């Protein structure tokens, strides 16, 4: 697994805990991604995208399967590269559930791509570092465009307030990307 320098220590530790060797390269997701592609090609490894891979999307879709018995009318899903949103939408759309994506203002590459603007963005700094994606995946872009009912843009101040309220009122320390849908 390749992660950029500066990746949160808890994420590195979490990946290593499950037996993966973590290599750090570059200062951004994109630099780490390019290095991972290069390693895969040079060593005949299978490259596995963090979000733009059918197996990853299917795995993340199991969250939608877990939600389905609770018969929600609407599910809001954080979007970075689109794997989670694609998987959850695939699992829930046949149940008649509205699926809405959520992105942070200035980190809204999927919302832009769905509207036809596929240019890379310079993602803003955000507490939701797990969704800082310059360009969403090709597969996930097609799935999100077809399956999502809407994408809402959340202001950083709203995200910050949500994280504080979760900590103070619920005694819950949440990752920024996870709290984005709240």
What positions do the PLM features span?
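PLP-dependent amino-acid enzyme catalytic core
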Residues: 1-182
